Amino acid sequence: MTDKKLPFNKAQMEKIIEKFPTPFHIYDEKDIRHRARALRQAFSWNEGYKEYYAVKACPNPIIMSILRDEGCGMDCSSYAELMLCEAIGVVGDGIMFSSNDTPAKDFEYARRLNATINLDDITHIEFLKEHGG
C-alpha cells in the first residue's frame, strides 16, 4: 500500500477554510492524473483496453474532464449522467451506458450520443430495439 499524503499542510488548509465554506471537497488533480496513467500503463499489454469512469461515483464535470483528458471513457447509468458527458464533449465510444429498469428516453438519448449500450438482461433487447435501436 502506498503512503497517502495531503497535497497541502495545516497552514494552507486553514487558509482554504477561511476562503471556502465547509463542508467542501478537495481533489488532487496531479494524483488523479497519476493514478489514471498508472492504470492505463498496467493494462497496456491489452491492446484496445479502455477504462470507463463510473460517473455515478462522483458526477463532477471537472473530475470527468480530467479523466477524459487521460483517456478514460465514462460509464453512465442515467439521463443526467449522459447530459454531463455531452456537456464535456464525451460522446460515441467514450460512453458506456449500462442501466437497469431504464426509461425509453434514456436509451434514446444514449443512441443519439452514439454511446455503447451494455445490456445485462436478455429481456431488454426488444425494448432497446423499440426505443433506442
Q: Model features per residue range: what roles?
A:
Residues 1-117, 122-132:
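A charged N-terminal "starter" segment
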